[in-house]
């Protein structure tokens, strides 16, 4: 089905800079995120006539409700989308609309030197005859997750205007700081008030995320000894070299650029240093909890061995878990996954449940007592200048959400 207000909403939202900041001490991490939520999202919800619209200051989230239109109890379903965008230029986004794509040509990003090439991004070929939306080459688009925000709004608009579609109470949430991994930690599950939910933050139509990485992160702070190179023999300890030596003891294959499918990895995010001091930041990913623990233990053992060789704690390790594979918990709630599967199939989609090589807010929320798989939103090539979405994919997301609302009510009779 086509939804005439979806594209204008999306274009409006992507032009608002709501980039999060992992180095911030405030929550939400940026004032611009909070302004986007309060001044744009809340106003649009009010115009749609939803109920219980409020900003939860502690959670940094906008909450709203689509009231039930049936006279019997239905499990309360929720949908979530995040308001922030990733760590890439988000200022002055200029969306470009490419109608009736021919499925073969390169798509120039604005007037820039950059192109979306189907030889590099073969998914483009699937969208022959459809409308591709890109940025202009110097920013990201913000499809992740302003696709989801636009779809939640359009879904709400449709249900409010079509009482013939029977559904129970539906809760909506617009959350901050997903891209930096801190938004879900503060989410108020009780205030949200749903029995189960879905994040709307996935890729191409058919993608259903019910299996994610388990994740940890760690940092190393290395204290070196700086001595003039002329007299350094036997005295200098180069902190940068110590960092290199540590990194080279991790499995060479287990890096993002060498892995796919269900393979995990160690990923060096940053390495800053001088002879005197170095700082390394890593993330660890594995689909199995045991595998995650094995990787963490390997890091600890390497650090211990190197410190033992130095005879002092020259390398300081800080490590913490981030989230766990939602599949382990969703095994107890397969009726929720089945609801999504059935809605996909009813809308003519082939369900793709390949493991998600990442995490979503739902990964954490599931372990906070809110079972929360992820459904597709039409996001492609997220987090950079080559990001794009497809208008027809966004339409299909709304179709699926409407069908899920109907099925949830039917099954409660």
From Swiss-Prot:
Zn(2+) 2 binds at residues 144, 179, 383. Belongs to the peptidase M20B family. It catalyses: Release of the N-terminal residue from a tripeptide. It comes from Lactobacillus helveticus. Keywords: Aminopeptidase, Cytoplasm, Hydrolase, Metal-binding, Metalloprotease, Protease, Zinc. The active site is at 84, 178 (proton acceptor). Zn(2+) 1 binds at residues 82, 144, 201. Binds 2 Zn(2+) ions per subunit. The lineage of its organism: Bacteria, Bacillati, Bacillota, Bacilli, Lactobacillales. Totally inhibited by EDTA, EGTA, and 1,10-phenanthroline. Strongly inhibited by divalent cations such as Cu(2+), Cd(2+), Co(2+) and Mn(2+). Partially inhibited by the reducing agents 2-mercaptoethanol and dithiothreitol. One of its GO terms (biological process) is proteolysis. NCBIfam families: peptidase-T, PRK05469.1, PRK13381.1. Coiled coil: none annotated. Signal peptide: none annotated. Its cofactor is Zn(2+). Cleaves the N-terminal amino acid of tripeptides. Shows broad substrate specificity, exhibiting maximum activity against hydrophobic tripeptides, with the highest activity for Met-Gly-Gly. Therefore this enzyme may play an important role in flavor formation during cheese ripening. Is also able to slowly hydrolyze some hydrophobic dipeptides, but displays no activity against tetrapeptides and the tripeptide Phe-Gly-Gly. GO terms for molecular function: metallopeptidase activity; tripeptide aminopeptidase activity; zinc ion binding. This is Peptidase T. GO terms for cellular component: cytosol. Homotrimer. Optimum pH is 7.5. Highly active from pH 6 to 8. InterPro entries: ArgE/DapE_CS (IPR001261), Bact_exopeptidase_dim_dom (IPR036264), Peptidase_M20 (IPR002933), Peptidase_M20_dimer (IPR011650), Peptidase_M20B (IPR010161). Optimum temperature is 25-37 degrees Celsius. Thermolabile. Approximately 45% of the activity remains after incubation for 15 min at 45 degrees Celsius. It is found in: Cytoplasm. It holds the Pfam family Peptidase_M20.
